[in-house]
Design a protein with these regions (language model features):
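Flexible helix-coil transition and linker loops at the boundaries of alpha-helical arrays
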Residues: 32-46, 74-89, 118-129, 163-169
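Helix-turn-helix repeat elements of alpha-solenoid scaffolds
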Residues: 15-34, 58-76, 103-117, 146-158, ...
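Alpha-helical adaptor scaffolds
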Residues: 92-173, 182-185
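Structural signature of alpha-solenoid helical repeat junctions
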Residues: 3, 45, 84-90, 127-134, ...
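Intrinsically disordered, low-complexity basic tails/linkers immediately adjacent to helix-turn-helix/homeobox/MYB/SANT
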Residues: 4-15, 21
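"A position-specific structural signal for the A-helix of alpha-solenoid helical repeats
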Residues: 9-13, 45-56, 92-97, 134-142, ...
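Long, low-complexity regulatory tails in eukaryotic proteins
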Residues: 156-225
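Long, contiguous interaction/recruitment modules in multidomain scaffold/adaptor proteins
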Residues: 1-6, 80
Length: 225
């Protein structure tokens, strides 16, 4: 149904930056989907809704148990694919978010996913692209988390390429912020890191995203006391 797709699009495109108002809005969307559409949806759409809900639950509660059942049931199939579907991307996001919350390392899966994901070429569907960007960002943040930098440059350049391709730079401050972290911790290049921090702060201000701007300033002050 058209209305359902509208709601799903909203859930996919909006990230939650720990903002309570957004969390409440998203909960309302999930409730509406459950009430009005869920029972009539085809199975793969039901799975998409469940995974989206689990991602939010894990993110907000910092408890990875919310995603365990879905990962157990579907993740193995995702790992066999060379072309990721929307649901595969959602599962990957859930998987690496859960690892990050549990502070677990899984380099084997990380390597396999990174090698597959950089060869994705399906840029036709805007929802898919938004999701791909979020997964790529999640993969970089996870690598920074576990101090493993092998795929970061490649993924960052892929993110920049996608932004140019689709003419949407709303994620640029996020990518600049991650680039700052990478230069600081991956390359030990403080000067470059500071440049990217400045870019991220100015970019967030330009987009009027004060929540993110303040978060970046906080991180910068931690990294450069």
């Amino acid at each position: 149904p058209k209305e359902y797709l509208k709601l799903k699009t909203k859930l996919i495109r909006q990230s939650i930056h720990g903002d309570e108002e957004k969390v409440r809005q998203r909960e309302a969307i999930f409730e509406e989907i459950q009430k009005r559409f869920y029972d009539q949806l085809p199975e793969d759409e039901q799975v998409a809704v469940e995974v989206l809900q689990a991602i939010d639950d894990v993110y907000v509660s910092e408890n990875a148990e919310f995603g365990e059942g879905l990962i157990e049931e579907y993740f193995e199939q995702t790992m066999l694919r060379t072309e990721y579907s929307t649901n595969d991307l959602l599962l990957l996001y859930l998987y690496f978010l859960s690892l990050a919350v549990n502070a677990e390392r899984d380099e084997v899966t990380l390597n396999k996913v990174c090698l597959t994901i950089v060869s994705q070429t399906n840029y036709d569907d805007t929802n898919y692209i938004h999701l791909l960007q979020r997964v790529l960002i999640g993969l970089v943040l996870y690598q920074l988390d576990i101090d493993y930098h092998e795929f970061i440059p490649e993924i960052l350049s892929m993110l920049r390429e996608i932004m140019i391709d689709i003419g949407d730079t709303s994620l640029k401050p996020t990518v600049d912020f991650i680039e700052a972290k990478y230069y600081l911790y991956g390359e030990k290049d403080k000067e470059k890191a500071l440049q990217y921090y400045e870019k991220a702060i100015n970019g967030a201000e330009f987009l009027n995203d004060m929540n993110f701007k303040n978060r970046v300033i906080e991180e910068k002050n931690k990294d450069f006391p």
